[in-house]
Amino acid sequence: MKYINKLEEWLGGALFIAIFGILIAQILSRQVFHSPLIWSEELAKLLFVYVGMLGISVAVRKQEHVFIDFLTNLMPEKIRKFTNTFVQLLVFICIFLFIHFGIRTFNGASFPIDALGGISEKWIFAALPVVAILMMFRFIQAQTLNFKTGKSYLPATFFIISAVILFAILFFAPDWFKVLRISNYIKLGSSSVYVALLVWLIIMFIGVPVGWSLFIATLLYFSMTRWNVVNAATEKLVYSLDSFPLLAVPFYILTGILMNTGGITERIFNFAKALLGHYTGGMGHVNIGASLLFSGMSGSALADAGGLGQLEIKAMRDAGYDDDICGGITAASCIIGPLVPPSIAMIIYGVIANESIAKLFIAGFIPGVLITLALMAMNYRIAKKRGYPRTPKATREQLCSSFKQSFWAILTPLLIIGGIFSGLFSPTESAIVAAAYSVIIGKFVYKELTLKSLFNSCIEAMAITGVVALMIMTVTFFGDMIAREQVAMRVADVFVAVADSPLTVLIMINALLLFLGMFIDALALQFLVLPMLIPIAMQFNIDLIFFGVMTTLNMMVGILTPPMGMALFVVARVGNMSVSTVTKGVLPFLIPVFVTLVLITIFPQIITFVPNLLIP
């Protein structure tokens, strides 16, 4: 069983490394030998579909898919257990339907993939049913644990018997499933989409993972309206991952992991300490400055909080800082990551909005610096009020030594941005270059990265990618319903009726996102609302590059606000302190964040000036 439990990790890690090698070969072949590999992108995308699916399976086994537990945490224990049982039953149905629709789309696939020698696209669609069967096995494993620990009323044997019965019906009497078509009994017409949206909100807020809740709501909609088109719609589950720009996401995740594994984060912190530690509030400034430097390498807020957090909090405690400020600064400064290039959030926005990722990278830099300065100003005020001590000023020799040790790490953002603008590689390829560069300096310069830790880092990146992959798949499927019913246009009409200017619209959108961010994870929120908000921005002639940066900053506020503030939980865990302590500490730092958000909303030129100047 030990080896079976490692199956996805070994296979996913191997495929991850294969994609890594293929894309490195592509860049070298084009830039060094001037002979691009025409098959490399298609093969990398095909393998990424499998990596994403395997990551979903790992997250099913570990029960790590994003869900909202705000309401369930308020429930009495028995009701919470009953609710969790119902949630697991819905997840079981979702996985079975993944297998069902996976088989149907596989059987219907027939087009060749020319770049891969004309092989059938069945190779892409096979990922859904094959890995979904593995997901079912992992789900049953997880339910064994849930039943033993008293989290569910249903034993694993119930799900095993149910799976056998459902598979028997699927293969021998598939027409029986037609009884589930609601349109056979009642015609709801245009009201169907509202019923589906209501069901989605209810099941999401009682704890169904966000990705699965989107899948259920969309299938419910099709069962009430156009079941005959559901097969074509479910193809988007697979096609959504067959995207070259999305390949940047797992490799920026990998870069952040390698920065921690290869000893790079510690050197970044030491350089920031030598540079800023002697000022009033010095260790707080070091914390914020290190986050700015690290953000230019990983592009992830939670990677910053988890990677640098433990190191930063320990150093601040040793310098005499209170726990609330240690946690508050660490949590607040991590939101710099999604603004400063490279940024995973910007990549996802660029894919959703079909905007230039290079322009988004540049556009986020100035707001990122503004947030940095604003947080430092608040830190200075608090440190002066509480009388925190300064650290001794670093000598010129110490400063030069720390700079020398961190030099290769600091080059990472310059390498990424310089490579993109020089045309050496695309924004997607920049993630591959960043990861490869992290391997080189971790293995050969700092000599702290081993081959085993590299493989384990790939496995960890694959598992995190699985959480993102489920969101991408199901939100694309959900988007089909939104598009068919023109929900985005209906929402836009409401904004048009209420708002009389672009600024009013931006204020309304900011207020909406700030409210939703308190209850919905930032990643989930990005996938859920952007497809509906982007058409509104377009209708009011709002620059979509500016809109992407503004919404990204706004959504990052959500990871700092309870009850769903993920950064609060991450910092509390790595700092060994309570969430309430971190929350208390982060509150004053929300003021400079809000001030910056208001500033860029009123003056969008702060964001758009530089990218428009560099990329007309």
Curated annotation (Swiss-Prot):
Residue numbers spanned by region TRAP transporter large permease: 191-616
Any one annotated GO CC term: plasma membrane
Membrane topology category: Multi-pass membrane protein
Record keyword Hydrolase present: no
Listed InterPro entries: DctM, DctQ, TRAP_DctM
Bilayer-crossing regions: 9-29, 36-56, 83-103, 117-137, 153-173, 196-216, 244-264, 288-308, 332-352, 357-377, 407-427, 431-451, 459-479, 505-525, 527-547, 552-572, 587-607
Subcellular location: Cell inner membrane
Misc: Is essential for lipopolysaccharide (LPS) sialylation and serum resistance.
Similarity comment: In the N-terminal section; belongs to the TRAP transporter small permease family. In the C-terminal section; belongs to the TRAP transporter large permease family.
Name of the molecule in the record: Sialic acid TRAP transporter permease protein SiaT
Lineage: Bacteria, Pseudomonadati, Pseudomonadota, Gammaproteobacteria, Pasteurellales
Record gene name: siaT
